[in-house]
Amino acid sequence: TSHGGGKAGKSKLLDVNY
């Protein structure tokens, strides 16, 4: 959750990319 952080409640793993 460093970049965007919780993109529409995405998965925690994807939260990093999004």
Curated annotation (Swiss-Prot):
UniProt GO BP: shell calcification
Top-rank taxon, per record: Eukaryota
Keyword Nucleus: no
Tissues/organs with expression: Shell nacre.
PTM annotation, UniProt: Glycosylated.
GO molecular function terms listed in the Swiss-Prot or TrEMBL record: calcium ion binding
Keywords: Calcium, Glycoprotein
Extra information: On the 2D-gel the determined pI of this protein is: 4, its MW is: 95 kDa.
Job description of the protein: Calcium-binding.
Annotated protein name in UniProt: Calcium-binding shell glycoprotein P95
UniProt organism field: Unio pictorum (Painter's mussel)
